[in-house]
Amino acid sequence: MSWQTYVDDHLMCDIEGHEGHRLTAAAIVGHDGSVWAQSATFPQFKPEEMNGIMTDFNEPGHLAPTGLHLGGTKYMVIQGEAGAVIRGKKGSGGITIKKTGQALVCGIYEEPVTPGQCNMVVERLGDYLLEQGL
């Protein structure tokens, strides 16, 4: 299965039990910042934004004072799982990033999708990739 198929079929799909509700944007990005696959709507990000995200995984709390920036959008960092998941909020939407052995699984949402639904979609794929040694 191609990385693009993972994005299209497992991240940008309808949310279980909520037909028509789906993430706004999603991507799978290598730890080095290289994009493995992304939705057409995923924002173009700067290398320093991805560096900041990777630093926060290695040093939890790094982004808390400044916020998480991706594609020029600033998200307020909310409770995640140290070293495993970073969650951010901006208005009625937000972002979830799950770290696997080799990649970051990213999902961005807006209402009517809820933070919990975004977490479920992103973390389910991230957990699967971890199980596969990726």
Curated annotation (Swiss-Prot):
Pfam family, one: Profilin
A GO MF label: actin monomer binding
Superkingdom of the organism of origin: Eukaryota
Motif, Involved in PIP2 interaction: chain positions: 84-100
Localisation per UniProt entry: Cytoplasm, Cytoskeleton
Record-listed Phosphothreonine modification sites: 114
Keywords: Actin-binding, Allergen, Cytoplasm, Cytoskeleton, Disulfide bond, Phosphoprotein
PTM summary: Phosphorylated by MAP kinases.
InterPro entries assigned to the protein according to its UniProt record, in alphabetical order: PFN (IPR048278), PFN_euk (IPR005455), PFN_sf (IPR036140), Profilin_CS (IPR027310)
SUPFAM superfamilies found in the cross-reference section: Profilin (actin-binding protein)
Signal peptide: none
One Gene Ontology cellular component annotation held by this UniProt entry: cell cortex
Keyword Kinase in annotation: no
Disulphide bridges: 13-118
Cross-referenced PROSITE patterns: PROFILIN
PANTHER family: PROFILIN, PROFILIN-5
Other noteworthy facts: The variability of the residues taking part of IgE-binding epitopes might be responsible of the difference in cross-reactivity among olive pollen cultivars, and between distantly related pollen species, leading to a variable range of allergy reactions among atopic patients.
Protein name: Profilin-3
Species per Swiss-Prot/TrEMBL record: Olea europaea
